[in-house]
Curated annotation (Swiss-Prot):
This is Mas-related G-protein coupled receptor member F. CDD domains: 7tmA_MrgprF. Orphan receptor. May bind to a neuropeptide and may regulate nociceptor function and/or development, including the sensation or modulation of pain. Residues 67-82, 145-160, 221-241, 295-343 are cytoplasmic. It comes from Homo sapiens. It is a multi-pass membrane protein. Belongs to the G-protein coupled receptor 1 family. Mas subfamily. InterPro entries: GPCR_Rhodpsn, GPCR_Rhodpsn_7TM, MRGPCRF, MRGPCRFAMILY. Pfam families: 7tm_1 (PF00001). One of its GO terms (molecular function) is G protein-coupled receptor activity. GO terms for cellular component: nuclear membrane; nucleoplasm; plasma membrane. It comes from the Eukaryota. The gene is MRGPRF.
Length: 343
């Protein structure tokens, strides 16, 4: 999550340092890990341009998602989650783009170091927020599919907004704690608190968030298979959520392997830092493509407005009165409500 500079392990200091920059510890280079005694070759210079191009494409795509989901498409509980996901991705991609510009131009000095520090904090916070939103939207979608009647009657009107706000606050709190223990307390001497924070973040992401997003997705997969056997069209919204979780799991493999090998077996990370950063950037840039592919109508040969495509991606495929007048699920009922009543 940090800049693409060469790494040198300083004696007596667990934090990786960037030579030629300031003496502040380079803490967020591998996502959130501060690995001891890792000496890595600098990434190829072309990687900075690849990062910059990828971030700019992702910023354009997520910017369109912010515009359409925020101002053009009628809101429903799941579009609110996607809106906050796009906001987190924009923040992370922006911080990574600034890093790429600074590294490409070779900017040095106190001000450049300050911008890098701000981008590290911003990137970590946005990354944690985006990861924590995926289990929330997966669990809510699973509840709306498996228990539609109970879910619609019991669900608070503003549940999506409240959950997103809480996740933003928790991500900011965890980021501040990590910054405090690993930057302010780690300037003088290496501290065990920073290592504990790294372990805590790994447990939070890989042992808590990942299972919480995978289990609801397994339930959605079973639901999709049951509908396929009954020759019913599956919900596009299910495909969107399954695709987003799959992209995250695939893109986080390298980061997870690095963390697991080091903290469990004390084996140095096998992958270069820029590989894990590139995978995270791909994950943040891929969501607009997922919305587009899920929402496009293959039977339409002519060009369709993006608003129509994105709105179609939110459909859940349920028909009112399906299965002998069964209760419609959340998204169908929300889309029929006036715009001011969506939560």
């Amino acid at each position: 999550m940090a800049g693409n500079c060469s790494w040198e392990a300083h004696p007596g200091n667990r934090n990786k340092m960037c030579p030629g920059l300031s003496e502040a510890p380079e803490l967020y280079s591998r996502g959130f890990l501060t690995i001891e005694q890792i000496a890595m070759l600098p990434p190829p210079a072309v990687m900075n341009y690849i990062f910059l191009l990828l971030c700019l494409c992702g910023l354009v795509g997520n910017g369109l998602v912010l515009w359409f989901f925020g101002f053009s498409i009628k809101r429903n509980p799941f579009s609110i989650y996607f809106l906050h996901l796009a906001s987190a991705d924009v923040g992370y991609l922006f911080s990574k783009a600034v890093f790429s510009i600074l590294n490409t131009g070779g900017f040095l000095g106190t001000f450049a170091d300050y911008i890098r520090s701000v981008c590290r904090v911003l990137g970590l916070c946005m990354f944690l927020t985006g990861v924590s939103l995926l289990p929330a939207v997966s669990a809510e979608r699973c509840a709306s599919v498996i228990f539609p009647a109970w879910y619609w009657r019991r669900r608070p009107k503003r549940l999506s907004a409240v959950v997103c706000a809480l996740l933003w606050v928790l991500s900011l709190l965890v980021t501040c704690l990590h910054n405090y223990f690993c930057v302010f307390l780690g300037r003088g001497a290496p501290g065990a608190a920073c290592r504990h924070m790294d372990i805590f973040l790994g447990i939070l992401l890989f042992l808590l968030c990942c299972p919480l997003m995978v289990l609801p997705c397994l339930a959605l997969i079973l639901h999709v298979e049951c509908r396929a056997r009954r020759r019913q069209r599956s919900a596009k919204l299910n495909h969107v959520i399954l695709a987003m979780v799959s992209v995250f799991l695939v893109s986080s493999i390298y980061l997870g392997i690095d963390w697991f090998l080091f903290w469990v077996f004390q084996i140095p990370a096998p992958f270069p830092e820029y590989v894990t950063d590139l995978c995270i950037c791909i994950n943040s840039s891929a969501k607009p493509i997922v919305y587009f592919l899920a929402g496009r109508d293959k039977s339409q040969r002519l060009w369709e407005p993006l608003r129509v495509v994105f709105q179609r991606a939110l459909r859940d495929g349920a028909e009112l009165g399906e299965a002998g007048g069964s209760t419609p699920n959340t998204v169908t009922m929300e889309m029929q409500c006036p715009p001011g009543n969506a939560s």
